[in-house]
Amino acid sequence: MFKEERLEKILEIIEKKQKVLVKDLSERFDVSESMIRKDLKTLENEGKLKRTYGGAIIERTKAFDENTVSRVFVNMEGKNHIAHKVTEIIEEDDVIFLDISSTALSIAGILKNTNKNITVITNMNRVVMEFDNSPNIETIFIGGIYNKKLGGPIGASAIEQINNFNIDKAFIGAGGVNIEENFLSNFNYDESILKATILRNSKKNYILADEEKFFKDGAYKFGLFSDVDYLITDREPNDEIKAALEKEDVIVIF
């Protein structure tokens, strides 16, 4: 089969299924996975699909500003997987930061049932509410002008308060993870400034990113891979992603 014919067939498959895996395409067309990755990159450069780790999807490339609550039910299995990994990392007497993200809400839902004595700093109102009946968890809510769409304050006052904390571990959601240029991004300017401030005030930084965040960019950068110690995701990344992260000494947890 000629390359052009294979590319057409790949497009037919992805238009039907909305998502394809490199492994499956390699077996179907009896070519190497490396060849399929080149095919997917060709199609991506033509604007016909978007690569993800392990395959490709038909999806726009920009992360967009959406209600936090609406994201809670997207990829719940992946978010819960990440949340369980996070709770395993949190230790007795840790001071942690959970920023505004649907994954942070999943983390809080698990943490509230543990016996760990910890301090949780957050700017997400629903995270605070999760700990109402958890006497072992001290909760500090960052104040400021409340963003109703996101569900918490993200402005100058919130940023100023974060500068006063000594955080052991920060768990930060990312709207996009760009492995080609090694940066993290988000879709709200003020929130991106806040995330950057958290990175500067934490001893260990953990980025939370499920499968859809790879090869996807928000409008505003908030950090580089070199600012991060760990990236927690819901599936094992492919070699390309792992190599980009390992080059910047980021440890991948999945």
Regions found by a protein language model. Give the residues of each.
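Glycine-rich SAM-binding Motif I of class I
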Residues: 105
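Generic beta-structure capping elements
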Residues: 59-61, 101, 142, 174-175
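Alpha-helix/helix-capping structural signal
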Residues: 102, 125-126, 236
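HTH-adjacent hinge/linker in prokaryotic transcriptional regulators
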Residues: 2-5, 9-23, 28, 34-100, ...
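Conserved phosphate- and dinucleotide-binding cores of soluble alpha/beta proteins
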Residues: 2, 12, 21-25, 30, ...
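A residue-level structural signature of the nucleotidyltransferase/glycosyltransferase Rossmann-like core
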Residues: 119-120, 169
